[in-house]
Amino acid sequence: MKTRFFTLATLALALAACNNDNENLNGDPVAAQFTADIAPATRASGTTWTAGDRIGITDIGNDSQYGNVPFILKNGKFEAEGKVIYIEDTKTHTFRAYYPYNAVGGILTATTDATAQQNQPAIDFLFASGATGDKNNPVVSFTDKTAKGGEDNSFHHRMSQITLTFEAGDGVNFSVVKPERYTLDGLLLTGTFNTADGIATADNGAQTGELTMNLADGNLTSSIILFPQTVASLPLVVNYKGQEYHATLTMPEGALQAGNNYTYTVKVRNKVLEVSEATIAKWNDIDGGEVNAGL
């Protein structure tokens, strides 16, 4: 798995009147045509939006009519997938959106086990809210407007992430044999995502478990996506040349926070693992530092 760093996804949504003018002169409903300016927006484990990606958009004040409306990315633009959203009155409308789209919406259950990690875009929940528009100003922009004194309406990662980079320490040579896999224990692997408010919640009533990830094709960097959860530390086991090397990852602030990527450097030494302290940033990279792995 390649090293990937994440930026907050941004999405510009333009509401265009049928006559292509910003001002609605005849009072007719304004058909909503959603287009996306995705450069340099990224999503889902550090990749750009991909053709076929689907988001769910809701007109917050008119959610009974325009709730969880699917839009799909085609030719670089998000288009209505069937139903079209209209602004039908003179009020200001506020919108929210989430990724990835689910036809049911509401509170979705998910797992972050090893199988789910193979399709990270499906568990990389994103959420944006607060962007507004009306008939005469039909441009709804899911972007960060704070630089101009406005609000941040951009898409945000709602899950947490841990990224491990493995390095050869004293007495170890990765040129021929590299670590095969690693296991993190003490994780809550199941939880929910609320498409209405963007909150991802770990299932605190569940039993914690292990997550084992193979380091395929000699990759020395691996990222996993997890539900935000309270956890002070996580036992780490690295399998290398038939031996188990043990260490502990310490969580800054005693928790995995939504939108943060906790990065650690794990040095495999002759008989120990050396693990750095975490660094934290907005998917959000949080440097965990170095970790020493020992037998």
Predicted regions: what is each one?
Residues 1-5:
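Positively charged n-region of N-terminal signal peptides that target proteins for export
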Residues 14-17:
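C-terminal motif of bacterial Sec signal peptides marking the signal peptidase cleavage site
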Residues 19-22:
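Bacterial signal peptide processing site
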Residues 24-178, 183, 207-226, 230-232, ...:
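Short, low-hydrophobicity acidic/polar segments
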Residues 62-72, 190-196, 243-248:
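Surface-exposed loop/edge segments in extracytoplasmic proteins
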Residues 99, 238-240:
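Conserved structural position at the C-terminal beta-strand
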Residues 106-113, 244-252:
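Edge beta-strands of extracellular beta-sandwich domains
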Residues 244, 251-295:
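Hydrophilic extracytoplasmic domains
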